[in-house]
């Protein structure tokens, strides 16, 4: 299995090394220009882009970061809802309209958003929100990052019957011609969970030492390795299928997979995976690691360039036999942040092919 994983990772590295990036260009002028980055996906896009603007600002790179997300959706569902105001999908067992229920968050050099959904937004379930087209037209975006849906059982859904290139083309049609001509598109591979494990930690967050129980850790790690191997195959398959529409791959799943094995960092939310609702990254160090991946891949930023880090991480765990979930704020230290930056950098292996 380890040999197979190494082969697959080398394939991903080849994709990155072949793809154009800010890191491989003359950045003397790029550093003076504002880079506008838009994420399109579900709430895992929100998680992963949470700290990108603040990270870039601390490295002296002016950016505008926006993410338009539709909770619990796939890119296929978003594509169908662009031009069909009546198209719905199931979200939390409720039929939700796609067309005008996007949440749009926007950041510009700060760790707090400069634009948020309107008060009373209710996550779009009340039919309150914005269209994807309005977000695309809000800025002359330089980069658009698409986030394929990754299901808990390990795989992206087979894109048979839906071609992600259709969504890329449709979004370019919304842009001014000169913007569409120069925009760079690519994909972000999210983190996922292993399947086939009876360990209840797959469904809830616990408070064991860094989430590790040695008696079953070998089984847990083997399941993660199997699952992650499949995600790497999916990443290669999808990027090759997108062809020229995929100029980069941001493998957040790779970074989370690798750093979850760090006994120190794994204390920030179980294995860096989940916050209170057992689905999302915790807002502090875990989201920071995900945002670092964007900064490294898209902006050519290195760990030594960055001074910003979130001051708190929110850890969720169960109490006693009641199963009640409580949250505890953990104070992050400079050494925590430095460790996170190095772990994310090492996981992406950027030093091998920049």
Task: Give residue ranges: language-model regions.
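Conserved catalytic region of serine esterases and O-acyltransferases that act on ester linkages
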Residues: 265-354
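Hydrophobic/aromatic-lined pockets within catalytic cores
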Residues: 57, 172, 176, 295-303
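Sec-dependent signal peptide recognition
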Residues: 2-10
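N-terminal module-boundary/linker segments of secreted carbohydrate-active enzymes
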Residues: 24-60, 65, 352
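Conserved SGNH/GDSL esterase-like catalytic core that processes O-acyl groups on lipids
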Residues: 46-161
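Alpha-helical cap/lid subdomain in secreted, periplasmic
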Residues: 125-283, 305
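Extracellular/periplasmic catalytic domains that process cell-envelope and extracellular macromolecules
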Residues: 31-32, 136-140, 178-180, 288-289, ...
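C-terminal segment of classical bacterial N-terminal signal peptides
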Residues: 14-22
